[in-house]
Amino acid sequence: MSQPNVSVKVGNVVFSNKAPLSLIVGPCQIESRDHAFEMAGRIKAIADQAGIGFVYKSSYDKANRTSLSAARGIGLEKAIAIFADLKKEFGFPILTDVHTEEQCRAVSSVVDVLQIPAFLCRQTDLLVAAAKTGCVINIKKGQFLAPWDMENVLKKVTQSGNPDVMLCERGTSFGYNRLVSDMRSLPIMSSFGAPVIFDATHSVQEPGGKGDSSGGQRQFVEILARAAVAVGVAGIFLETHQDPDNAPSDGANMIEIDNLQRLIEILMNFDRLTKNELNIHA
């Protein structure tokens, strides 16, 4: 089994480059049980009203923070209980990122998608361990890699027996503390056969741009998301928060949840136009 599935189903949510757009959306990290439930409830209500499928995302450990003093999250043990309760309460599929082989095994029982962070996307043992859990795998493209380099990364998962894998574009290093989004990477990675996701919030990040933390340019999230959907992708990855300027991590990139519904509606309109055009000329 070495070919990826062109369509990946996560619960009731379908990710395919030719199917209607789906979302991966949630706060950067689990700040508390109450905050996780508040955000989850609001996101689900917005997505249900818009009529779009989504996977809820949140991190239990931000292991690659800029400085040692930065808030990393609540940790794996507490997160496992919260993820289980979120799924029981709301019924949606859940994504979280993993950093070690041991974490893959520990968290795979309560989440549906294991995400490989961009900085770790070439770590063979991590990819193989994630693949063997049977969860869907979402691999962030390293900021240091060309899009065609991701074909070998993809094969590490599929050749380990897991065809349910997605590739995620999140920007490319462009000098110091800057990322740019090369939209050519989306069709290039799509050509490998797997669904492609565009991370619209981390793509505007300024890594280490504030000295002891990362900055970001939130005002460009919508612009880049529209561009990616116009190219044609399976899904958009968005981080959101009720008060991003005071969030413990990635606040400069996250969109305010009050603006989420409007953005989703815009992206769905772009997606309908794009997919109709692609299907006409297929």
Swiss-Prot record:
It comes from the Bacteria. The keyword ATP-binding does not apply. Gene3D superfamilies: Aldolase class I. It holds the Pfam family DAHP_synth_1. Keywords: Cytoplasm, Lipopolysaccharide biosynthesis, Transferase. Pathway: Carbohydrate biosynthesis; 3-deoxy-D-manno-octulosonate biosynthesis; 3-deoxy-D-manno-octulosonate from D-ribulose 5-phosphate: step 2/3; Bacterial outer membrane biogenesis; lipopolysaccharide biosynthesis. GO terms for biological process: keto-3-deoxy-D-manno-octulosonic acid biosynthetic process. This is 2-dehydro-3-deoxyphosphooctonate aldolase. It comes from Bartonella bacilliformis (strain ATCC 35685 / KC583 / Herrer 020/F12,63). The gene is kdsA.
